[in-house]
Design a protein with these regions (language model features):
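Conserved AdoMet/S-adenosylmethionine-binding subsite of the radical SAM
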Residues: 64, 68-72, 76-79, 84, ...
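Flexible, glycine- and charge-enriched loops at secondary-structure boundaries
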Residues: 53-60, 150, 154, 184, ...
């Protein structure tokens, strides 16, 4: 696609992981886009926040060519996952990339918070027709607690999930488990009830909070939002899994 000046749309790229096993089915080529409007307290990639700080910009065509070189490695079982940052902030680039990937028979996934979703933006229809899987990060089921945790409420995320469900788009739901913030039993039960209203959820994952991102905050001269918050115990993780998945 061309933008209004007739230039090819470029994506703001943070990094790539050529063979990742954690973001979708099989082996994945994971493309991390630059830029995010959320400020999740547990974010471990604060270096992806500022949209102007992209490591590089590249056209969808260039990135697709890079990906296609790895096609033999990820084969039929794997594919491509676009993560971030927040991929939905770069809709035109994402759609253009997925068009080329689908022409090449490659499985497409988006790892997103759903926060930028706007039901009145017609571009989503086109994107979702090219999307095989959405890995949806539900930050918090409670709108106010979500706002407190991320700076943004969860209404758009819930609307996005319903749109995916209504349009037959497969999704995985992810909940990051942070002691004292996202592990309240009643909240988790509400999350489970909400998941049960969605028709296309193939998998629910509980991601235990970790502190691997701490050094990045120091490098960026930022204070670490969660201070000394402990990582969850095995028991806390199992309890959350029992409610959300069991």
């Amino acid at each position: 696609t061309m933008d209004k000046d007739g230039k090819k749309v470029s994506g703001k790229i943070h990094s790539v992981e050529t063979l990742g096993a954690a973001d979708g089915p099989g082996l994945r080529f994971v493309l991390f886009l630059q830029g995010c409007t959320l400020r999740c307290k547990y974010c471990h990639n604060p270096d992806t926040w500022a949209a102007c700080n992209a490591e590089r910009t590249a056209t969808a065509e260039d990135i697709a060519n890079e990906i296609i070189r790895y096609k033999n490695y990820f084969g039929k079982k794997g594919g491509v996952t676009v993560s971030g940052g927040e991929p939905l902030l770069q809709l035109d680039f994402l759609t253009e990339l997925f068009k080329i990937l689908k022409q090449n028979g490659i499985h497409t996934a988006i790892d997103t918070s759903g926060a930028p979703y706007n039901e009145y933006d017609p571009r989503y229809k086109e994107l979702l027709a090219l999307t095989d899987l959405v890995i949806l990060d539900i930050k918090h089921i409670d709108d106010l607690k979500c706002r407190e945790l991320t700076g943004t409420g969860n209404i758009a995320t819930k609307k996005f999930a319903k749109t995916l469900s209504d349009n037959g788009v497969a999704m995985w739901i992810r909940q990051v488990l942070v002691p004292g913030l996202t592990d309240d039993e009643n909240d988790l039960k509400r999350t489970r009830e909400w998941i049960n209203t969605l028709k296309t959820v193939e998998r629910v994952e509980v991601l235990p909070y970790h502190t691997l991102g701490k050094p990045k905050y120091e490098q960026l001269g930022l204070s670490y939002p969660l201070g000394d918050t402990p990582i969850p115990t095995r028991e806390q993780i199992d309890k959350a899994k029992a409610i959300l998945i069991g």
